[in-house]
Structure formats: structure tokens, C-alpha cells
């Protein structure tokens, strides 16, 4: 059956700020306490969505989550009226207010792991929201993620949106940022590729400086839950040294799609064996596997992390060629820029590079790949998606006007203590659910 890959980008929320919450994420740490521009951040992301939609790629949008999360603050023991709660948290535990106010749900690569209907045991598209247990500000996302996905993918005969895995370090799950899929064509059965940083129960190498956020046990549980065949599933461990260098998710060191894996030379433990297993399993499904491996001598891990070369989108055009979508920072690093020029001029499957300014997201450690959740859909499944979330000229204009109306153009850490920010955010989100036609998604609407 004919199918295509759709990308659902997270719309940056009104409380976008820099609080340095993500240990192991170099950009997040380096920009702690910087001044953010939520309006610019949201418009940069929206422009990327629109340009890719204009090029013919299927492009949807995921709404922001409600922030600050009053539910979290009340669960942590702060009682009283909302303005009073925010005032007391800001005074006594500002780090908790920062966590409750984070707009990190914009990075929808961490929203869930998705398996298309061609791969699953029951012929439905399966979603497992990521529990994101490694960080407080992200561990509060999965309930809202599940609610949003169930509103967007509501037909139970075609879609299954599971609960997140249990929230324990043994099952730490970071979603699609550590997952990709290879296939001969989107509508055919493919090979699903899960990458983990450590195992809870198996002995093996682990990073020493920064935590490994994804466990083997979580990856395997998601594969089992989705009903994936063992002979079409591959697990690989991310190299501990690259995690210690700031590669906190696999999508900072590798990206794959269809028949191609684009990765750094040092991405995986026992890298050749990983390639061999992917090649053999894909060949059994009549697919040819191509690897574009970037030598460390040409682009170092440090360059990969600072430029986010691999936190790119690898998109398949209708003619079978592939396009790499990279952040502007790749052109500002001379070694990475030289490599990309060489790649585009070669006969590799990737023969075009698109560059986007996503500076506001990048300063928090999120490039093009972080901002999108990939969902392979056949024609009937695509028709069953909530119709108001697909980017076109009309929706782009409405969202651009909505951002202009509701978002601040400056947000400092101290501004999180302003109770008016909560009301501004709720007013914006209430209007957004009407624009997207998603009903009452948020706690304050219920």
C-alpha cells in the first residue's frame, strides 16, 4: 500500500526560555540564564514547517503544552491561589519554577516512538509516548503528549496511542530521538532501529561524565509493545565516549531514513556489526542499505555537537533522492560546511542541503531533527488524522498571526515569576485549540 512520511513539528510555546535544565546537553548548559525570544523561536520553527510543506513534504504541527505546569507545582506541595503559588516558588525554589515553565515539549522527536502499520502485529500505527524520566522538566510531558496524540490520531481502528512506559531509570525512554526506520518503500514492512545508551541488567560500557538517558530495556519494551518482528528489529548501543562529549540523544550523531543511514564514524559500539545487521535484515525485505559515514578526521565529534550536523532531517523526495535539512550553524563551522559542499557534489543518495535559521531552539540544544516527530501513514491513515493540523497557506497565516498576537519577544529567567505569563499562555493555547480543531486539550479547559 502506498504510504508517505509525515513530519509533525512542535510549535514552540509562549514560555520558551533558557534555564540550563538539561545536564549533558552542551548548548542548554552554555546558554543558561540567557534572554530568550519566544516570538522569534515560534516563528523560526513555523517557517521551517511552511517551507517544507511548500516543497511537497507532508507537514503537520503539534501544539505546545500548558506552561507553567500548575499541576507539577501543586504536586510538589505549593498550595493556594495560582499567583501566590508562582510567587512562593519563584522566591523559595526558582529551579522548580524553571522546570515547570520549560517549553521543551517543542522537541517532538522526544514526544513518542512511532511504528507504522506495515511493521506492527495488528496493522495499526502504534505510538508510545516517551516517559523522559531523566529530567524533571521533561518527565511531566507524557500525559499531555498522550492526550494530544489521541486527539490527533483518534481512530482506534487505525491508531494505538499507548501509555508511557513505567517511570523508572531502568526503563528510561527518550522517544524517536533514539529510533529510526529503514525500508525499501514507506508502505512496505521495514527494519526498525533502536539506539540505547546503557543497559540496566546487562554488563557493558557506560559513559562516565554525562548520563545515558535511554536504556536497552526501554527500547526492547517499546518494540514488544508495538508488536515488531525480531527479524526486522535492530538494537545498537551509542558509543559512551560520544555521550560524554555531549551527544545526549542518538539524533545528535546519526540520522536515517528509508534506505540511508547518515552518521558519524564514532556513533555506535561495534559499528561495522551494526551496519551488517541492518544490511542483512533490510535485504530480506528487498531493501538496499546505504551508509554515509562521516570520518572523525573530517568532522570531529565536537564539531558535530556544536553544529548539529546530524540533528538534521533526512527527507525522501518523490524522485528517490534525499534532502538534508540542517541548521544555520552548519554553515558557520568551516569544516562542517566544507563537508556538506562535498556531500552535495558527490553521487551519494543525499544530493541537496537546505539550511534553516533555528537559532532560538539551537541555543537550548534542539535542531531540525529535535523539532519533528516522523509518522509514516498510508492514504487512509492520513485521511483519519485531525484535519486542522496540516500546514498549508491558510494555517500558516493563522498561526503566524496567533504568534504575533500572543507571544512576548523577550523572556528573561526573572520573568517566569510574573503570574501574568500563565494567563497569557492560557489565553493563547485556548485560541490555538480552536484554530487546530483539537477540542479541550488542556487542564485549564476542563
UniProtKB/Swiss-Prot annotation:
Pfam families: AstB. It catalyses: N(2)-succinyl-L-arginine + 2 H2O + 2 H(+) = N(2)-succinyl-L-ornithine + 2 NH4(+) + CO2. Its EC number is 3.5.3.23. It is an enzyme of class 3 (hydrolase). The active site is at 174, 249, 370 (nucleophile). GO terms for biological process: arginine catabolic process to glutamate; arginine catabolic process to succinate. The keyword Protein biosynthesis does not apply. The keyword S-adenosyl-L-methionine does not apply. Pathway: Amino-acid degradation; L-arginine degradation via AST pathway; L-glutamate and succinate from L-arginine: step 2/5. Substrate binds at residues 19-28, 110, 137-138, 213, 251, 364. Keywords: Arginine metabolism, Hydrolase. It comes from the Bacteria. InterPro entries: AstB_sf, SuccinylArg_d-Hdrlase_AstB. Homodimer. Belongs to the succinylarginine dihydrolase family. NCBIfam families: arg_catab_astB, PRK13281.1. This is N-succinylarginine dihydrolase.
Amino acid at each position: 500500500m502506498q504510504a508517505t512520511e509525515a513530519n509533525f513539528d512542535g510549535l514552540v510555546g509562549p514560555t520558551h526560555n533558557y534555564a540550563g535544565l538539561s545536564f549533558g546537553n552542551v548548548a542548554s548548559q552554555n546558554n543558561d540564564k540567557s534572554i530568550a525570544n519566544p516570538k522569534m523561536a515560534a516563528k523560526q520553527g513555523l517557517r521551517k514547517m511552511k517551507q517544507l510543506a511548500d516543497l511537497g513534504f507532508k507537514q503537520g504541527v503539534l501544539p505546545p503544552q500548558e506552561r507553567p505546569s500548575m499541576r507539577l507545582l501543586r504536586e510538589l506541595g505549593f498550595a493556594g491561589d495560582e499567583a501566590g503559588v508562582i510567587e512562593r516558588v519563584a522566591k523559595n525554589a526558582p529551579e522548580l519554577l524553571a522546570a515547570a515553565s520549560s517549553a521543551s515539549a517543542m522537541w517532538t522527536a522526544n514526544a513518542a516512538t512511532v511504528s507504522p502499520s506495515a511493521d506492527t502485529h495488528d496493522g495499526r500505527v502504534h505510538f508510545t509516548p516517551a516517559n523522559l524520566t531523566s529530567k524533571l522538566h521533561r518527565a511531566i510531558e507524557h500525559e499531555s503528549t498522550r492526550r494530544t496524540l489521541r486527539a490527533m490520531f483518534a481512530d482506534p481502528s487505525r491508531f494505538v496511542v499507548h501509555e508511557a512506559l513505567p517511570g523508572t531509570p531502568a526503563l528510561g525512554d527518550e522517544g524517536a530521538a533514539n529510533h529510526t526506520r529503514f525500508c525499501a518503500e514507506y508502505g512496505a514492512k521495514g527494519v526498525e532501529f533502536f539506539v540505547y545508551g546503557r543497559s540496566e541488567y546487562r554488563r557493558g560500557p557506560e559513559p562516565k561524565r554525562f548520563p545515558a538517558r535511554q536504556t536497552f530495556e526501554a527500547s526492547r519494551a517499546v518494540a514488544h509493545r508495538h508488536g515488531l518482528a525480531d527479524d526486522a528489529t535492530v538494537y545498537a548501543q551509542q558509543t559512551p565516549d560520544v555521550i560524554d562529549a555531549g551527544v545526549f540523544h542518538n539524533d545528535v550523531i546519526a540520522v536515517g531514513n528509508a534506505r540511508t543511514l547518515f552518521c558519524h564514524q564514532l556513533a555506535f559500539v561495534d559499528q561495522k556489526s551494526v551496519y551488517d545487521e541492518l544490511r542483512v535484515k533490510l535485504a530480506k525485505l528487498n531493501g538496499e542499505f546505504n551508509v554515509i559515514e562521516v570520518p572523525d578526521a573530517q568532522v570531529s565529534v565536537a564539531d558535530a555537537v556544536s553544529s548539529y550536523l546530524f540533528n538534521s532531517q533526512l527527507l525522501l523526495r518523490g524522485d528517490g533522492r534525499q534532502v538534508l535539512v540542517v541548521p544555520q550553524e552548519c554553515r558557520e563551522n568551516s569544516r562542517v560546511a566544507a563537508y556538506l559542499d562535498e556531500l552535495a557534489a558527490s553521487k551519494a543518495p543525499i544530493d541537496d542541503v537546505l539550511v534553516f535559521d533555528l537559532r532560538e531552539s539551537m541555543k537550548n540544544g534542539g535542531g531540525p531533527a529535535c523539532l519533528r516527530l516522523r509518522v509514516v501513514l498510508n492514504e487512509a491513515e492520513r485521511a483519519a488524522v485531525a484535519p486542522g493540523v496540516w500546514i498549508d497557506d491558510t494555517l500558516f497565516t493563522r498561526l503566524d498571526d496567533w504568534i504575533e498576537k500572543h507571544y512576548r519577544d523577550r523572556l528573561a529567567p526573572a520573568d517566569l515569576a510574573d503570574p501574568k505569563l500563565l494567563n497569557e499562555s492560557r489565553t493563547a493555547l485556548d485560541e490555538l485549540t480552536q484554530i487546530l480543531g483539537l477540542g479541550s486539550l488542556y487542564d485549564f479547559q476542563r
